[in-house]
Amino acid sequence: MRVLITGGAGFIGSHLSERMLREAYQVTVLDDLSTGCVENLRRAFDYPGFEFVEGSVLDATVVRRLVAQSDMVVHMAAAVGVRYVLDHPLATIRTNVEGTHIVLDACAHFGTKTLVASTSEVYGKNVSDALCENADSVLGPSSLSRWSYATSKKLDEFQALAYASTHGLPVIVTRFFNIVGPRQAARYGMVLPNFIQAALKGEPIRVFGDGRQTRNFTYVSDCIDALVRLLRSPEAEGEILNIGSPHEISMLNLAERVKSIVGSSSQIVIVPYDQAYPEGGFEDMRRRVPCICKISRFIGWSPTTSVDEMIIRTIDQAHKRLALPAGLLAHESSPPALLPQR
């Protein structure tokens, strides 16, 4: 069975590619390498059933040809990262909305099962304690470009469900809540790799806002486990499902944990948002907590990796990338005190 993964050279897509190959699927990755990189697929190239196609989901001819050769499609290609979205609002909208339309249209033509990756950003400013999939989207004003991402991904969800109801397309939509792990790039504003990179270099760890805002991080291998199970679940077709952790951590606490685990001398510096994003267009949420009752009910899934373990595993990759001397990290000599799982 062949799986087409759009955006498969990216952070999550490359991990999914490896997992599917290990489970004896054939995998085709379509990626324009705008934010992904071939290095992420280094292990995938070792498998005879792997194919990489450099190209864009905006190229309808290429997309249709690859969908025709595939038994399932996982649509991960998207504009990602706060910095990228703020700098490229038009490209964000076009890639996310038009690219998803092209993929869904090809999948509907061939009747190919499809999983569309969405985001917790679609909940916007909703302040509910635990966000269920049917919770309202409370999006900010059009004058703030950061909302172009959330709005475009919400339209992707509408498109997916419309293709399901109109054309009978077997489609699943997943909403990711802050997936982290090896291969996540710091350059697009992703918080954990930025903290880790600064700590390893002994540079200031910059915490935006007041540091009391919280997020719920999910390790990439837990996310991949959920995706694989959903692809094998006919009951999940036509559904939207959260993939995330119910356990919160503040950004200041996260920075402190990274500093402690690395054994870094870095200072933690609080940076107000107007200094972090002087060009404007940014607005942050105080907290965003997923309800995972639905996905647990459908496939029995819940994340198992603690925050400290996520940090350690991500540090190990960054450590190798920066070619720092072995034994530098504090966690190599003594185990960290694990965060309480509330």
Task: Give the location of each predicted region.
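Short, surface-exposed alpha-helical segments at coil->helix boundaries
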Residues: V38-L41, E157, P193, L252, ...
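Residue-level signature of the cytosolic catalytic core of signaling kinases
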Residues: D46, V127, Q184-Y188, H247, ...
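A short acidic, helix-capping loop that chelates divalent metal ions and anchors anionic groups
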Residues: V82-L86, G181-P182, A276-G280
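The catalytic Tyr-centered alpha-helix of NAD(P)H-dependent dehydrogenases
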Residues: L144-S152, F176, Q184, Y188-L192, ...
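C-terminal substrate-binding subdomain of Rossmann-fold SDR/epimerase-dehydratase oxidoreductases
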Residues: L16, N178, A199-R342
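A short, amphipathic alpha-helix embedded in the catalytic core of nucleotide-handling enzymes
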Residues: D105, Y163, F195-A198, A226-L230
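N-terminal Rossmann-like NAD(P)+-binding domain of SDR-like oxidoreductases, especially those catalyzing
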Residues: M1-F177, T314-G327, E332, A337-R342
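Hydrophobic alpha-helix immediately C-terminal to the catalytic Tyr-X-X-X-Lys motif of short-chain
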Residues: L155, Q159, Y163, F195, ...
